[in-house]
């Protein structure tokens, strides 16, 4: 490809609204342009990268036995109503109505649609298992699109769905997809970590996320410093290692705490450490209000609470709902005398002579003994903290930031039961299809790669997904001898199977070199002043100095350099 013909509108300045490095560089290097908040056009360079990522995905998915199909982006509301997700999914689901007042959704996921397709077709255990995948645009009306492709409203995704007759078959396919994802993310050049995660709005009973490690990542990864344990912060387990405090419980007593309404303020008023207090938070689920308790220096993990309750959704109760139920407001809430379900973290059970709200204005209880003063169900309910004991007993946990680029789910019968998708087992009895679901953010993966592969001059593409293999530069595009040598090199490299971007523009050398660094192709060849002597410069984009090479030896030198690159 000759660069004089390539549509590649580069920018010299960093766009003011671009926070993430990948957002800045992909805009500056002419890979994409923004059309609206969270909506982008992929220009030719980006399309080449995306196509290579998609090719790797197709190779590994098909190699793992999956079959590609393509489903519509517009989905009938009735399908989402069958599973209840039309109401549950919330405002992120983009909805529309056609001229006949029929309701539709722009696909955020395709569980309902794929289930509607197979429920009349996969009607016997003899036709199972099956794994179907597609690569397609997805849509989510993000409240605050940010970081370019890392959180957009329209994005490219690979989603796959497997159907099984037994749980054992699902487990096998889950591991099959886990292994395929490991190969995919390794091939595209990502440093990543698979972590235990929450299934969120998708549902199901087991899931792993694949995170690309990056400082800009919105997710916190918890990992052991001495083992392979890793989990999303929401799912990282806190070990029940607490023993009851060795002190005699004193009589429960009400005390006036004035306008102190935070754990920090109340602890200061009473002259007690925060870990001697009980933090109370009230949540609302479809089951009603529930009170969550953690130690004062800990934070309630609402995902753990949701999973413990088996709730479909969970949110913090409003002040009005709390006032109606407890005749009090946040800041003085507590479990004593509360007429609602109470779930507490293990650390609370170990407290003696602690502090909690009295459900009265400006009043708290002191000398609270959980085993004596209220009843609660105990479970792991808090967010872990750095330095906690690793759940597997090996070492302690540390935190890192990650970008979620993929996720695998064990859906079970969550969708098949709701949509009456059944098959006949060996005994002729109807059973719900057992499902798995497997997603990869294709456009997000491109952005995540940039977050890991760049320097102060621009992008450094891993060779597997670079838009071109080689950047060939005629340093002086007005010099006939340089252009002639460059043309010869261009033909030789192309004939040898390399994809080459040939900068034949009549621009200054500094502009060409800056653009080359910004675009970040793996190998660069400069055809300059020594071209008449049959000498060119060869260098790798990732580090390394330019090396003078005889033109006759160039092809072999390029092969050798390219093979040694990541």
UniProtKB/Swiss-Prot annotation:
Broad enzyme group: ligase
Any Pfam family matching the protein: tRNA-synt_2b
Keywords, ordered alphabetically: Aminoacyl-tRNA synthetase, ATP-binding, Cytoplasm, Ligase, Nucleotide-binding, Protein biosynthesis
Record-linked Gene3D superfamilies: Anticodon-binding domain (3.40.50.800), Bira Bifunctional Protein, Domain 2 (3.30.930.10)
GO MF terms, alphabetically ordered: aminoacyl-tRNA deacylase activity; ATP binding; catalytic activity, acting on a protein; proline-tRNA ligase activity; transferase activity
Enzyme Commission number, as recorded: 6.1.1.15
Cellular compartment(s): Cytoplasm
Gene Ontology biological-process annotations: prolyl-tRNA aminoacylation
Main location as per UniProt: cytoplasm
Domain comment quoted from the record: Consists of three domains: the N-terminal catalytic domain, the editing domain and the C-terminal anticodon-binding domain.
UniProt function note: Catalyzes the attachment of proline to tRNA(Pro) in a two-step reaction: proline is first activated by ATP to form Pro-AMP and then transferred to the acceptor end of tRNA(Pro). As ProRS can inadvertently accommodate and process non-cognate amino acids such as alanine and cysteine, to avoid such errors it has two additional distinct editing activities against alanine. One activity is designated as 'pretransfer' editing and involves the tRNA(Pro)-independent hydrolysis of activated Ala-AMP.
Annotated protein name in UniProt: Proline--tRNA ligase
Originating species: Exiguobacterium sibiricum (strain DSM 17290 / CCUG 55495 / CIP 109462 / JCM 13490 / 255-15)
Gene name of the record: proS
